[in-house]
Amino acid sequence: MTSNLKYKRVLLKVSGEALMGDKQFGHDYDTIKKIAGDIKELIDSGVEVAIVVGGGNIYRGINAALVGMDRASADYIGMLATVINALTLQNVMESLNIYTRVLSAIPMMSVCEPYIRRRAKRHMEKGRVVIFAGGTGNPFCTTDSAAVLRAIEMNCDVLLKATQVDGVYDSDPKKNPNAKKYFTINYKDVITNNLQVMDLAAIAVARENKLPIRVFSIKEQGNIAKVVQDQGEYTTIEE
């Protein structure tokens, strides 16, 4: 079945907010279990999966910096939040018998494995899901940038960005009911129009390395596998 797949290895970017469900903070385990089930559906189809998780459901470094906290310190706290999310997602996925490894860009040997590129690729070759935590390990970098970098390092065919809306719009569809949706858009237009789908540094790196990005809503159950199979609602960002 794998030979018929358009994308054989993917990286899924899951925001911290996606793990909250309808809560205002923390984790909603029913929501996380649904996400894990969607990931399992993708794995069962023969796709190798890596994941980058955000930390915004627990801590947002850029917001803390706005109220006076040192930005670098705030970003490091945010990186720790991504480790909490990665371990939470790992435990839920393992309850569904999905073999999973957490690798952190910030070494914490008692908690998870350190990020080593060759080790991560070997895990994926063995059929394990790799969850990357700790962002890039550097302050002033978003988890979107981490997702693009890890996707390139893992030789992924596509980056799947799971969001709260079903694609890229010319303005916020939650605020503007007349917002126009793009079904395909190139990297240059995302940058030129300053579309807020992900930070512009991440888009620039994706463009330089010809990494396609698919943006879709994680709220619809089964959507991850649909997007990989060219079904459902999504926007593709490519050259």
UniProtKB/Swiss-Prot annotation:
The lineage of its organism: Bacteria, Pseudomonadati, Pseudomonadota, Alphaproteobacteria, Rickettsiales. GO terms for molecular function: ATP binding; UMP kinase activity. Homohexamer. Inhibited by UTP. Keywords: ATP-binding, Cytoplasm, Kinase, Nucleotide-binding, Pyrimidine biosynthesis, Transferase. UMP binds at G55, D75, T136, G137, N138, P139, F140, C141, T142, T143. NCBIfam families: pyrH_bact (TIGR02075). Belongs to the UMP kinase family. GO terms for biological process: 'de novo' CTP biosynthetic process; UDP biosynthetic process. SUPFAM superfamilies: Carbamate kinase-like. ATP binds at K13, V14, S15, G16, G56, R60, T163, Q164, Y169, D172. InterPro entries: AceGlu_kinase-like_sf, Asp/Glu/Uridylate_kinase, Uridylate_kinase, Uridylate_kinase_bac. One of its GO terms (cellular component) is cytosol. It catalyses: UMP + ATP = UDP + ADP. This is Uridylate kinase.
